[in-house]
Amino acid sequence: MTTTCRALLVDASFPAKKTRGWYYNLAIAKAANWFRAQGADVSFATPKTFSSDGSFDVAFVSAIFSWHVQGALQTAEWLKESGARVEVGGPGFFALTSMARSRGFDAQMQPDPRFDRTPGAYDAVFWSRGCPAYNCALGYPKDGSEPVCLVPKMEGSRSTLYDDVTPAPMILDNNLSALPRRHQELIVERTLAAGFKKVDCNSGFEPASFKPETAMLWRTLPLVAWRFAYDEIAERKAVLKVIGILDEIGVKRRKISIYSIAGNEPVEACEQRVREIREWKCIPIVQRRRPLDYLGGPLPTIHDWTERKLIDFQRWGNRLSYAMPFSAYDPKLNHSGVKAMGSGHGR
């Protein structure tokens, strides 16, 4: 690659409108550094802002979520027609590689070996890849169904450890508490030395592998929250164990954020999990179950769920579950549980 090479990086999952959540495409940031190291001039775009006027030699189109894959492929086709050499990739393609192949692209759905190990200072970091949580039915379903979590198949069921990364305030590792003790110490020591005012372990810890010594180690960082999941009723005992450990070291319950997927169990079980999180004075983070090949449109559901019920349940769980049972929820209620003026009654 010469210094005249022009590279375009397209983030197909970039939010179409501003959201209150945090968003960062680490793959795009690493790809930019890799292309620059090859001497390329790098430009960035989204499917709505890119140009297919033939001004780029190479292009990489990334999709984090499966429902952005069709837009990513359309963008890739336009760029290919303009004469650019185009690659597509990202976790969104995990269950959709055959779709990409049918349209002429060999999708890189696992961490790209060129980009993943590219050094640099990023807003987020992986100190490890993989997840050995064999007890998790989302990544390791026992009934032969397709997994809802892609991490074990995409990154491996064993942890791959990295010790040559630059610390960042957002830690993305999928299962920190299952990492070898020495590697956890390395992460904490280097992150602490970086002097960040706040640190977020975004994917968090696994209840089954969380121990008192885990809490004692990670409490030395200025964590914005202690994050872990309560995704199945069967995890209740392990979740309570973690809460008890955090109580022992003085962590306030409001600093505990518990992920809770909705739609993987019947409504009654999912509601029980959310209401228990509220009863424990912790913060629920309710997420809707989506198949890994979900392309958008009507959402396939199982058990006694409908898409409308899932949407309502997520809003109830995150905003109003402290005030009422799900049966009393009305979409017309505001965040304080007050019905807007002039609205009707009932659901």
Spans of features found by a protein language model:
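Short catalytic/ligand-binding loop motif for oxyanion handling, primarily in non-cytosolic enzymes
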Residues: 17-18, 68-70, 94-98, 133-136, ...
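A structural motif corresponding to the C-terminal lobe/cap of the Radical SAM core domain
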Residues: 217-227, 232-347
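Core AdoMet radical
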Residues: 9, 58-66, 90, 140-242, ...
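A short, structured N-terminal alpha-helical element that caps or precedes a catalytic domain
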Residues: 1-98
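Canonical Radical SAM [4Fe-4S] cluster-binding loop centered on the CxxxCxxC motif
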Residues: 20-27, 34, 118-163
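Anion (oxyanion) recognition and catalysis
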Residues: 36, 80, 192, 247, ...
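Catalytic core of nucleotide-activated saccharide and alditol-phosphate transferases
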Residues: 80-140
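A short acidic, amphipathic alpha-helical/loop segment
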Residues: 71-78, 99-100, 186-190, 213-217, ...
